[in-house]
Structure formats: C-alpha cells, structure tokens
C-alpha cells in the first residue's frame, strides 16, 4: 500500500477533528466579517497560520503512527512490534499488549495440541507395531493348517487385518513422510510382484487373478516403502470393487518415463465421483450403503505422490472398470523437484 493511501486513511480516521478545527476557524472568520472592530486580515492570517500548523502536526503524527499499522499490514510478528515499541499512544499500546497476550496464549495452546497429537500418533504407531507381532505369529499358525477351505478363509481374513494395520501405520507416518523417505534405484517389476504376493490371499478368495505384463529392465528412482504402499492401495481398491475377473498390470515407457498401468473390470467410478476419490473419507455418492470402504487408501496415494514425483491418472467407466496410470519421473527431474521443495 502506498504512503498516499496510508495518509488518506489517516485523514479519514481524523476527519471529525479536522472538520471541527475547520468549523471553529470558519466561525472566527464569520465573526470578523460581522464585527467591524475585528480586522479580517488579521483573523485571516491567524486562521492561515493555525491551519498550516495543524497540517504540519497531522503530517508529523502520521509519520509516527503509521509505522505500527504498516507492520500490522505486512503481517509482522506481534513480538517484533512490541519489541520495537511502535505503539505511540496509550490506546495503541493497550491494543498491542492485548494482541501480544492473546497470541502468546494461542501459541502455547497450539504447542500443547501439537505435543498431544504427536503423543497420540506415537502411541498409535507403537500399538500397530505391537499388534503386528501377534498377527505375524497368527500367519505362521495358519500356514501350519491343512490345505482346504478353512485355511483359505483364515488367510483371507489375516490378509485383511494386515492390510488395515499397514494402512493405519502409513496414515500415522504421513506427517513425517519427508524425513522418512530414502530414494534409490529399484526394479519396478520387483515392487509390483511383492505387492501381488502380499494381496494374493484376498484375490484368490474373490476368484481374481493377475495378468502381468511387466518389462524386466525397467528401473525407477523412488522410495521403495512408500512406492509399494501406493501400489498396494491401488491393488486393494481394485480387489475391493471387483469379482471374478483378472486385474491387468503392465509396465512400459512413454516419452522416456516409466509407466505402470493397473486395470480392473469392477463396478467403476461414476463421473461425478471421479474428482473426489482422493479426498480423505470419501467413498461414493452412488453406493451409500457401502460399509467396507474407509476412504483412506486413495487418500494415502494422493498424499505421497507429489513427494515421490509420481503422476497418477485415473480413467473409469461405470460397469466396465477403472484404470490407474502411474507415471514415474526421470531421476534428474525428481532431483530438481526435491531441490525446489528443500529451498522453499
């Protein structure tokens, strides 16, 4: 904001006093005009002198008081304003002291809440880690069961529990994901096969197979743990809304970028739901009675894709299925993006 605009605002706030001073001087001029014993020239000189001194006083006052408002306008910290003692009159000082006390109290509350949230997240993370130990032991016990329908059912339920625990674990790690990432060159085929193996019990229970067309020599520069999480959530989403039809997974290069395509033939996503599928907690506006979906999986995908530099594109037709296309960045592009994030 320019100084002229600041001065105009200053004059508007003092308009009552200015009008009052002008009014008093007009009365003096009127009295001099009516009373012949009073010299109009003398009164005119006095009025001119008073108005000139008043203008100088207003300019001087403006230069002193405007510093406080300019600091507030520029979003300066209240501590800086208080330290520089920019408040000139008692009213301004009371306002600054009030804001200082209020903001200090709010900051203390925010710190307390952040510590509470961190403590809760830490407790939840420890709980998930602790509960995964008996879940792993449960898997060993299930593996000792004889082959049959009972074992398949147990493996299916175990896989669902393990998936939910992993989802919750990654959800609690979102805030610290930047510190938790380690980028390295790895085989995309290996990442996909590992996740297919992890979800095989659910796919077998639903009669769904995997049609894999993965090029052997395609490597990506990424964080293995978080990238696997993205693939897992997309596979989980495809398995959840498919029944009895294979999921096609293929990899290829497109314009120098490694691309992973996951296509299912499930119920698909409606056109009006497509822009919202990455929102936390969003499930569907069509199938409102759906209780198996939490709306967390694709939210996790959306939360880490930018840090990994992966572009995610979704195509879907109701009744025909959904295709997720993951385009990986080149290593130099990812490094440049990470540098930009670091310098921001």
Curated annotation (Swiss-Prot):
**Domain Histidine kinase span(s) in chain numbering:** 126-332
Listed PANTHER family: HISTIDINE KINASE, PHOSPHATE REGULON SENSOR PROTEIN PHOR
Any one GO molecular function term: phosphoprotein phosphatase activity
Its post-translational modification remark reads: Autophosphorylated.
Alphabetically sorted, this entry's keywords are: Antibiotic resistance, ATP-binding, Cell membrane, Kinase, Membrane, Nucleotide-binding, Phosphoprotein, Transferase, Transmembrane, Transmembrane helix, Two-component regulatory system, Virulence
Q: Which Pfam families match?
A: HATPase_c
Write the protein's name.
Sensor histidine kinase GraS
Membrane-spanning parts: 18-38, 43-63
**Which CDD domains does this chain map to?**
HATPase_BceS-YxdK-YvcQ-like
The protein's organism comes out as Staphylococcus haemolyticus (strain JCSC1435)
